[in-house]
Amino acid sequence: MARKPDPGRRIVADNRKARFNYEITDTVEAGIALTGTEVKSLRGGKATIGEAYAGPSGDEFFLFNAYIPEYLEANRFNHETKRPRRLLLHRRQINKFLGATQREGYTVIPLKIYFNERGRAKVELGLGRGKKLHDKRETAKERDWQRDRARLLRDKG
């Protein structure tokens, strides 16, 4: 049975492939610095983070390659669709991500963009390591087995 959505948390974009392609070890909620037209476009439910990643630029973290389309009702002061967007993180979180990406071969992947209870845009970041092909096959096999098992139990009972 599907989970009921959290009443205060409206998900705008979900990176479902990230959990398949990466082994996520830790997740962190981060704020994101947006312009007005980006917020309006997000409120319309339009964003793509399938190819996005987070990385350092100087001593800050940015969200790269996230696509937020232009707001159609805006005038000439619209935003760039794939510009780097600053992530609002605490210093210790930035240092943790920097250490993991530089020393241990991890990647920082955006998992979701959503609006919290107060109406602020947030990004759920995951610290993950890329899966090998045999790990992906194992995940697919496990998922198929769970589906078959549920079907068998449902049909028997």
Swiss-Prot record:
It comes from Methylobacterium nodulans (strain LMG 21967 / CNCM I-2342 / ORS 2060). Pfam families: SmpB. This is SsrA-binding protein. HAMAP family: SmpB. GO terms for molecular function: RNA binding. It comes from the Bacteria. The lineage of its organism: Bacteria, Pseudomonadati, Pseudomonadota, Alphaproteobacteria, Hyphomicrobiales. It is found in: Cytoplasm. One of its GO terms (cellular component) is cytosol. The gene is smpB.
